């Protein structure tokens, strides 16, 4: 049995390849009102899902973008996540 290598969704910009990911992350929840102990204990972070190309991943941050210029090295729809908030990264297959 010959196993095929997985092909992942990616783009090439200025000779650099960027891969498309599903990013699952914990979002901070804040409330400036008064609350009881019971209400406070019920607070939880929101589990968020974002999709984008990974621009850079370091020990401290994950940088993503979702839009780009087809003729220039220019990025839009950008996000930067603290790595401590990242729960899961999934590379998207074609």
Label every model-predicted segment.
Residues 2-94:
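Conserved RNA-binding domains used in RNP assembly and mRNA/RNA metabolism
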């Amino acid at each position: 049995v010959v196993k095929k290598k997985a092909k992942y969704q990616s783009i090439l910009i200025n000779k650099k390849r960027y891969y498309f990911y599903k990013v699952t992350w914990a979002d901070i929840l804040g409330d400036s009102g008064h609350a009881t102990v019971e209400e406070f204990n019920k607070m939880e972070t929101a589990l968020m899902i974002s999709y984008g190309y990974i621009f850079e991943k370091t020990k401290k941050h994950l940088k993503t973008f979702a839009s780009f210029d087809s003729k220039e090295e220019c990025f839009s729809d950008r996000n930067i996540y603290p790595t401590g908030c990242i729960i899961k990264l999934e590379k998207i297959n074609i």
